[in-house]
Amino acid sequence: MSGNREQVFPTRMTLGLMKTKLKGANQGYSLLKRKSEALTKRFRDITKRIDDAKQKMGRVMQTAAFSLAEVSYATGENIGYQVQESVSTARFKVRARQENVSGVYLSQFESYIDPEINDFRLTGLGRGGQQVQRAKEIYSRAVETLVELASLQTAFIILDEVIKVTNRRVNAIEHVIIPRTENTIAYINSELDELDREEFYRLKKVQEKKQNETAKLDAEMKLKRDRAEQDASEVAADEEPQGETLVADQEDDVIF
């Protein structure tokens, strides 16, 4: 029992502190439980979206590979060199923002195309222009899917770690802090009850002692009164015959 409670002095002030702590622990448990449920729900949604994004990525990359093969066939094998030489500024860009989910900030990545930059407008002008344009569109969708997948996987990793930490806190509060606090409160209540019983027994003994002393004093006073009354009766009895003798003597004198 002592190992499952806190080492405290059993006083009423400590009891009040433990009750406040228990109330705070219950509130914290409720909040963390709701937070864990909200994060778990979002985690499952992200997991489903990751599966969908991976399937979409597979289809897009397969289409992109065929499109690149068509471009290579239509324009020649040096298309890669031409593309690298044409690029000066990134046209496809990514911006990041943060989303607050139950106090957890998740990084969100969004891709966008700068319409003012178009370094590939002359690529494929000689031949294969249609295939090059189609490949550009397909690979743009592929990059968008990659950015979406990266955003989801980043959120997945963050949520996974936060959920583990939150669940550990929930379990610690539920199985350690709350039981220890309840055991401490029960211990303090039992000790205070024992102190109350001891105090009641002590007061009862003091009251009995006072009652015995009062009864003893009353008995002594009664005994003194009885003795005084008895002495007064004896004195009265001794004085009464002398008065009768005196009267008798006077009567004898008158008759004689």
From Swiss-Prot:
Its main location: membrane. One of its GO terms (biological process) is vacuolar acidification. It comes from the Eukaryota. Keywords: Hydrogen ion transport, Ion transport, Membrane, Transport, Vacuole. Gene3D superfamilies: 1.10.287.3240. It is found in: Vacuole membrane. It is a peripheral membrane protein. One of its GO terms (molecular function) is proton-transporting ATPase activity, rotational mechanism. Residues 211-256 are annotated as: Disordered. One of its GO terms (cellular component) is vacuolar proton-transporting V-type ATPase, V1 domain. Residues 211-230 have a biased composition (Basic and acidic residues). Belongs to the V-ATPase D subunit family. Present with 8500 molecules/cell in log phase SD medium. V-ATPase is a heteromultimeric enzyme composed of a peripheral catalytic V1 complex (components A to H) attached to an integral membrane V0 proton pore complex (components: a, c, c', c'', d, e, f and VOA1). Interacts with RAV1 and RAV2 components of the RAVE complex, which are essential for the stability and assembly of V-ATPase. Subunit of the V1 complex of vacuolar(H+)-ATPase (V-ATPase), a multisubunit enzyme composed of a peripheral complex (V1) that hydrolyzes ATP and a membrane integral complex (V0) that translocates protons. V-ATPase is responsible for acidifying and maintaining the pH of intracellular compartments. This is V-type proton ATPase subunit D. The lineage of its organism: Eukaryota, Fungi, Dikarya, Ascomycota, Saccharomycotina. The gene is VMA8.
